[in-house]
A protein has these predicted regions:
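Active-site loop/helix belt of alpha/beta enzymes
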Residues: 2-9, 16-147
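Short intrinsically disordered, low-complexity coil segments enriched in acidic
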Residues: 1-7, 164, 176
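Functionally critical, mid-to-C-terminal surface segments that flank or help form catalytic/ligand
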Residues: 133-176
């Protein structure tokens, strides 16, 4: 942004427990201080602070309470050094539906935007008033017969319980 002559608008991600990117708590002081310094220099504007739930599709999972607490702590740390992000957000589809305390300034619906329930065992798409937004179609590019006990795909996430015919469609993770 600086070399291009523009002020970068950034949102800072903190790790609250998903452990998939974001500044870990041990680095917050340095992370927020650097962001504040760059903002004071006019290089960036910190527009948001965010994180992501690991277990929101299981509303009673204890990690949800812990992650929300850690996120609130991160907000306090950022504000204590003078950062005032306009948007603070952690809620995915499941937290949007089942954890109103985590709505903060905005929510980030993902799977529910497509009309799917984040956890059909709790509530179906229909129960939630969601309508599927698309239909996915693909061509079968290979089919094979497998014996009982054959592992399929990375990590053998599916193991045949009896002789089974499987088909490959060229889409998604590892074309499975």
């Amino acid at each position: 942004a600086c070399s291009g002559g523009v002020v970068g608008r950034v949102q800072l991600k903190v790790n609250t427990g998903l452990s998939r990117n974001g500044a870990p708590e041990a680095q917050w002081a340095e992370f927020f201080a650097l962001a504040k310094s760059l903002q004071d220099q006019g290089s960036i504007i910190v527009t948001g602070l965010w994180s992501h739930f690991a277990c929101a599709d299981e509303p009673d999972h204890p990690a949800n309470e812990q992650q929300e607490l850690v996120f609130r702590t991160a907000i306090s740390h950022a504000e204590a050094i003078g950062l005032e992000p306009e948007f603070k957000h952690i809620a995915n589809s499941a937290a949007t539906l089942w954890r109103p305390s985590a709505h903060f300034d905005l929510v980030r619906c993902g799977i529910s935007i497509y009309g799917l329930s984040p956890n059909p065992q709790i509530a179906s798409s229909r129960d939630l008033g969601l309508t599927p937004a698309m239909t996915v179609k693909a061509t079968v590019v290979n089919a094979m017969d497998l014996p009982k006990g054959a592992g399929v795909s990375y990590g053998h996430t599916f193991v045949t319980e009896h002789p089974t015919r499987v088909a490959l469609v060229p889409m998604g993770y590892a074309e499975g």
